[in-house]
């Protein structure tokens, strides 16, 4: 559980999980997938969450603690709109059912097209 971030995790839970993240044995922050996989992973995640190049991030950190804290906060902020929408839908079963119906109809249309192409490709009559 500690290494898993759920979309439904609270911001404080996300930040706690990142604070417990395993880093590397030395104290320097640099990007090196082979020698420093823990720190490199945090830098990759922070890069995605903030849309900042890894090289620029690595230059800004000298301690693991600050890197972990900032990564947790950035991921929590990135996931907050999803978590908020989840909570809204959880409290409105009617809206959730409506959205599921719309999704099912779209999926059925895509699946029918794909199935028709597959039938034609193998020489079977279309449905």
What are the residue ranges of the model-derived segments?
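Conserved nucleotide- and phosphate/pyrophosphate-binding catalytic cores
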Residues: 1-127
């Amino acid at each position: 559980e500690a290494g898993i971030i759920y979309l439904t995790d609270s911001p404080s839970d996300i930040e706690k999980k990142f604070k417990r993240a395993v880093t590397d044995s030395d104290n320097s922050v640099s990007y090196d997938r082979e020698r420093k996989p823990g720190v490199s992973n945090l830098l990759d995640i922070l890069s995605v969450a903030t849309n900042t190049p890894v090289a620029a991030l690595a230059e800004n950190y000298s301690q693991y603690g600050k890197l972990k804290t900032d990564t947790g906060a950035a991921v929590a902020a990135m996931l907050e709109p999803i978590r908020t929408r989840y909570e809204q839908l959880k409290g409105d079963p009617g809206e959730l059912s409506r959205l599921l119906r719309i999704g099912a109809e779209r999926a059925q249309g895509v699946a029918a097209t794909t199935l028709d192409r597959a039938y034609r490709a193998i020489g079977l009559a279309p449905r």
